Amino acid sequence: LTEVAAFLFHTQGGIAMFRHWRADIRAVMERDPAARSTLEVALCYPGFRAVRRHRRAHWLWNHGMKLLARIVSQRTRRRTGIEIHPGATLGEGLFIDHGMGVVIGETAEVGDNVTLYQHVTLGGTGKDVGKRHPTIGNGVVIGAGAMVLGPFRVGDGAKIGAGAVVLKQVPAGATVVGNPGRVVRMF
């Protein structure tokens, strides 16, 4: 508990967490025309609440308090409908819009300024050991119901269409649609 208090009120970790929170609120304000104030985002956006609580759980996970991290994560899932494993790494400016049903697996890595819509899964494909979830680059947009499954990279600025099932690497700037996912456009 002393470690947690030191983290939140005293350390570089606490400062970084608040910096991430500000970036996450700013992302919602910039990307959602329905967002009217930062207070509204902080109180009424379940995607923001899930990411904020994940950042706490992730810190606990990385400091050996894995059970407590899982408890925070599961309470967040029950309250928001968004499941983010505390081992997952999230960049700044993540916006989960209409987040019900979003799942982000343990070894997933999400870059900065990423947008995820409802029912997105960043998951694995089985019981592999080690890295088994995707790495999402900066500025990626993943549409509603898309599944990105496996230990590969989605390049910076890529767009994954609604309902796509992506099982292999996506180049930077590509647009991927369909099941199985296929590149239909490159920038």
Each predicted region: which residue ranges?
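Left-handed beta-helix
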Residues: 80, 85-86, 91-92, 97-106, ...
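Soluble, non-transmembrane catalytic domains of enzymes that act on hydrophobic metabolites at membranes
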Residues: 3-32, 95, 111-112, 119, ...
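Terminal amphipathic alpha-helical/low-complexity segments used for targeting or macromolecular assembly
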Residues: 1-80
